[in-house]
Structures are given as C-alpha cells and as structure tokens.
Amino acid sequence: LNEMFLVANTYPTGSQEFIDVFETAVRMYPQSEIANINAATAALSRNELVSAERYLGMVNSNKNLPEYNNAMGILMLMKGDYELSKKYLKVAEQLGLDAARGNLEELVRKKANAAKMKKNGK
C-alpha cells in the first residue's frame, strides 16, 4: 500500500492518474482504512459524494486521523451541513493538518454565500 501511495505522489494531485492509483489501492486493500480515506479524498475531488461517503464509512478505528476528519469536513461542506463540517474541520486543524485551515476558510465563504442567497430570496 505504501508503494502505491509513493506512485500516486509522482502524479499531479487530483490528476486522473493520481485518482486511479488510489482507486486501485482501495480495490486491492478494501479493509485498509488509509486506502479508504485516500479513495474518499479522490472521490471528493470528482464531486462523487456517494462514493466518498461509502469509503469514509469503512473507517472505524482511525477516526482520530486528521485526514479522516478533513475528508469528513469536506464531505459535509459539499452536502451543505456547515455545522458538522466545521466540527470535523476544527478537529483536523487541531490535529495539525494545515489543509484544514484552508477548508475552514472555504466553509466561511460558502456560509456567507448561502446567507446572501437566502437573504436575496434565491
């Protein structure tokens, strides 16, 4: 599994090749929680929320990982559950994941846009 992660990182993040490696890894190691978190992240990059939720649902013991909390935060953000998104992203940030800070900033922007649209009656 580690070798597959190293291969994935030879491709640009988010590229089809990068995503394909993570999807292959989760097929080869379906019980690996790390493989499922990586596959969920790849699914989120393609806006495949159902797949991402299924992969994240396979994580049972590694819910303290910042990557898991970040992925859950992004999933909840994309589903429009801003409060739950904030909860997960705050945990990821507190666990030291720098990307979570940027995602929290995105959450603030999304909430502001949603409030503005609601105010304008859209």
Locations of regions flagged by a protein language model:
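Start-of-helix register in tetratricopeptide repeats
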Residues: 2, 34, 67, 99-102
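Canonical tetratricopeptide repeat
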Residues: 3-6, 38, 71, 103-106
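Register position in tetratricopeptide repeats
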Residues: 10-13, 45, 78-79, 106-114
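Single-residue signature of alpha-solenoid repeat helices
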Residues: 18, 51-52, 85
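Alpha-helical solenoid repeat scaffolds, predominantly canonical TPR units
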Residues: 21, 54-55, 88
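Canonical positions in the second alpha-helix
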Residues: 24-25, 58-59, 91-92
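Short coil turns that delineate tetratricopeptide repeat
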Residues: 30, 63-64, 95-97
